[in-house]
Amino acid sequence: MIWGLLFLLFLAVIFIGLNAFYKQTDYFKWQHLELESYKQGVPEQLDCGGFGSTYALYAFQAMPQYHSNNRFFNFSLNAESIEQDYLLFNKYKSHFNKGAFVLFTLAPCVCYYTYEESPQYNSYFLLSHKELPNFKLSRFIRFKFPLLYDFKQIFRSLKFLLNGQKQELSLDALFPQSVSEEVAKMNMKGMAEGWMHLFRLPNLREKNQDELNERVLKENADYLKSMIDDCIQHEMIPVIVITPLAKELTNYFGKAFLDNGMYKLIQDAVGTHQVRLLDYLYDADFQDNRSLFADGGFRLNVAGSSLLCKKIMKELLEN
């Protein structure tokens, strides 16, 4: 009996050790690359910070060069919902100085996106169980011990280690510097069709008619409003930023869809407050220049990020 228990204990120790090893491999880190900055710690006394989804994660790559001594932090995550923005903002708002710029970054379809649809790993990694909506112990265990549900990952990580060359963990390394016109059109067509499928939309030109989308739109407006109110209460400066997209993607959008979706969300969230809106959606410098995008029209590369951040800081500091 005691030998059996000791053997089980030995297996448990081996399994925990393998999980710890796996989570330190580049194979695992590449899957959760946006968390690397969080692992280094969120600085105190921030003068500026950005919240948003994938588009913001890439858009703000160059922003630290405008803020010395770690005074900027990009809180954005891949496929992040506005509710996740809200949860992270509440956790880290004490890290901002008075007078700091808090950039809430939006794109046309994020207004219909919910927390439950977003990847849960990031939330479980960054937030405590008390801070998480609908915390589930089974989900926590799955994220804590990924090999428990897919042990083959340890072999994939070893294959990645043996076959791949050591590469610096960076967002820009995930994509080429730019893509051809043909690839850009294909990528953006896939993105537009993916949004239509995810949000049950016949197209991205007409006003949304889906009742669930309308409910989510109102909820997300409430989350954004709460963050704006909190900023003003704590003497921080909320700024809404709409990141640029190339024409390969904006050609899918119609005025009715945007006015009754993203822009309605902004209007409802801002209310009577005077909140600056920096709208680069159709910015001419980006519309016809897919070379500024890593995927042809959605994710900015380093050059695109540098240009956008320069524009943003010019607006913030001159007005």
Residue ranges, per PLM feature:
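Substrate-gating cap/lid alpha-helix
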Residues: K247-Y280
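Hydrophobic membrane-insertion alpha-helices, especially the h-region
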Residues: I2-F21
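Alpha-helical transmembrane signal-anchor/signal-peptide segments
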Residues: F21-G41
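Active-site segments of SGNH/GDSL-like serine hydrolases
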Residues: I228-K255
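Secreted/periplasmic serine-hydrolase-like ester/acetyl group-modifying domain
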Residues: P119-I237
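Histidine-centered active-site loop/cap adjacent to the catalytic His
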Residues: F293-N319
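Short extracytoplasmic
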Residues: S37-M63
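Membrane-embedded segments
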Residues: Y55-R142
